Amino acid sequence: AAWNLNLNKRLNDVQFSKDWNLSKNISIPENVVWPTYEAGTNIATRKVWGAVIEELAGKGMFLVGGSADLEPSNVTEGFAKLVKDFSKDNSSGMNLAYGVREFPMGAINNGIAIHGGLYPFGATFFVFADYERPALRLRAIQKLPCISEYTHDSIYVGEDGPTHQPIEHLMSYRAIPNLLVLRPCDANEAVEASKLAFQQKDRPSLVLLTRQSIPVFDREKFPSSDSIKYGGYIMSDCKNPNIVIFATGSEIWVALETKEMLSENYNVKVINLGCWELFEEQEEVYKNNVLSFPESALLVSIESGITDGWQKFTGRKGLNIGINTFGESGPGVDVANHFGINPKAVYKKIIEKLK
């Protein structure tokens, strides 16, 4: 009773009342200025997350969270400096220094989301998501709008080797109901993916981001980066395709380069499937348009992970290019080349399949 009495007194303050009401119905502030990135540059998408959360925190998003002892790598350092650590001496801090404790991080964020008034996020390497998995599954069951920012989303982790390189993870998290798995293909699409995650009210999201720099696409030549809201869209079209390439995230540029190499003799359509869950929610007319191609077309998937599951789109006779073993230690580019995740290797596999 005393607490409620004190609250009612404080609600007489106009600014406090405004903040209180906003915390009870969290939404993206109207004055947010989203970062934008210049076409033709190369940027690691993990850097986008840092820019996004710093902007949101500075505009009163009631954002709380942090990294499992990987602040520099997850690019949450700037957020931590801006909002300060929560501690026994600073209860107003909004950065949670979780330490190397992925499951407690997930469980703590679930509790915050259940209580309401704050929008929680957690960050670590994608390969360590499995430590957090029981909490992720529970939040999907409970329809909690929590976000997990997972960086180092593929074998491009590099020298840390197979213990740090996610292989089976993408498909295993796509298997959890009521969970958005967003894997943007460039920096501007990463901004849009982050927006989508923060707009969710009754389900959690994973935002999967690269360690390595990848090209920023010219959206005057390609569809708008907010097309990821459809989950899947035609990245590069053609008439009467002989070949259709499906890809996500950092493999989109590989697909587009491969198309260029094939274009002299083949018509190639490239489809970006950055979020399978959102794509499945689209109307049948839209999905049928994206997935429109002759029955004779060769269907190809490219993704830096296991290929099981891609048959949903490529069929029994398709060509699924990925990694069905654990990774290797070495520079990211060298590891990708070893596993054939580059345009020349993909081109060669497609030509072999067509023979």
Model-derived regions: residue spans:
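Thiamine diphosphate
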Residues: 2-355
